[in-house]
Amino acid sequence: MSADTETLARKVREEVIKPEQSTLISPDRQSPSLLRREATVEPRFELFHFVFSVCSQKVRGTLMEKGVTFGSNELTILPPQSENYCPQYVRLRLRSEAAAKHRPVSSFTGQSSVDSEGFDPLVVPTLVDHETGRILADSKAICLYLCDALSGGTDLLPADIREAVLKQVQLADTTPHVALLYGADPDGDRRPESMQAVMPGIHAHKIDAVRRNIPLADGDPLLLEAYQHKIVKEEAAASFVINEPQMRTAISKAEQLVTDLDRDLGASTGPWLFGDRFTLADLFWAVSLYRFLWLGYSGFWKDGAGKPRVEAYANRLFARPSVKDAIIQWPGHPPSENVIHLLSNA
């Protein structure tokens, strides 16, 4: 690993991450209970993430399916803490491959995909590979990297169906999760009451948090530019989530994705999208379907929606160990009355 990458990662871990939020996750200990300072091994992979981030959930699930030990560094990304806005963390992401490859974020579409949004240096997750010195900061790219770099564990990207799996991964990656989280359904807010209570004015709070960090960017034009782009994005988001036509379009797109998923499941000869083989596509859909359920959008496939294949598929996904450990049971997940039955069956 390059000394520069090591220094950047260490500064975030030591100056931003709370000690109790820096833990070691291993195949035989998949909950964040072993403090990093008490661990006897230095992991190859180090993940900076947040419990509730769908992008973080995809990466956590991939790491667990591959059966690797990794360092877990949890950031609190909600205002007023907004630890993902700290200069140390933003500088780490600005050195990532995604920062060099993608245009800076400058708009809001309701998705979290780098392909549609551009690169946002102020979000999660970020993965550091201590063996190669690479810094990866796009969840889809991180998961593909792990699939190609690691031969052990579940073969999430089989060579003979790689392109078909990637097509499904891309579909799941374009789901407008962010819009459905921050914005209400104009025809009746379905989100948990606790979430409805904290969302009004959330983008203004995020912008304030960014502005508090701007003085720390003195002498660092790249960092300053990152903060400026973030403000533009959050201003656009604030307008998007109260625009009824845009919200209806986002909800309609999400429901159509589930309809298309039901069709694709009908072509499968097994429990997963590609027969008996659990792939990265299934993991990405697990994250999407769980978020829909959590938010109150399970009506996309339940309650007379006529999609029994998706309903059965979701139940299988939610029972999979990696999905339970990386998403459903990961400590600190915000409460939702829509998923209590899954937690009680844990």
Swiss-Prot record:
Pfam families named among the record's database cross-references: GST_C_2, GST_N_2
Name the pathway it acts in. Answer: Xenobiotic degradation; gamma-hexachlorocyclohexane degradation
Keyword Transferase part of the UniProt annotation = yes
Listed InterPro entries:
Glutathione-S-Trfase_C-like (IPR010987), Glutathione-S-Trfase_C_sf (IPR036282), Glutathione_S-Trfase_N (IPR004045), Thioredoxin-like_sf (IPR036249)
What's the catalysed reaction?
A: 2,5-dichlorohydroquinone + 2 glutathione = chlorohydroquinone + glutathione disulfide + chloride + H(+); chlorohydroquinone + 2 glutathione = hydroquinone + glutathione disulfide + chloride + H(+)
Keyword flag Transport: no
State the Gene3D superfamilies in the record. 1.20.1050.10, Glutaredoxin
User: According to the UniProt entry, what is the EC number of this protein?
Assistant: 2.5.1.-
Name the Gene Ontology molecular function terms of this record: transferase activity
Alphabetically list the UniProt keywords: Aromatic hydrocarbons catabolism, Detoxification, Plasmid, Transferase
Q: In what residue span(s) does the GST N-terminal domain sit?
A: 43-154
The record's PROSITE patterns line, in alphabetical order, gives:
GST_CTER (PS50405), GST_NTER (PS50404)
Q: Where are the transmembrane segments?
A: none
Q: Which domain of life is it from?
A: Bacteria
Other noteworthy facts: The mechanism of this reaction probably involves a glutathione transfer: the halogen is firstly removed through substitution with glutathione, which is then removed by displacement of the aromatic moiety by a second glutathione molecule, producing oxidized glutathione (GS-SG).
User: Into which family does the record put it?
Assistant: Belongs to the GST superfamily.
Role this protein plays:
Catalyzes the degradation of 2,5-dichlorohydroquinone (2,5-DCHQ) into hydroquinone (HQ) via chlorohydroquinone (CHQ).
Q: What is this protein called?
A: 2,5-dichlorohydroquinone reductive dechlorinase
Organism encoding this protein: Sphingobium indicum (strain DSM 16412 / CCM 7286 / MTCC 6364 / B90A)
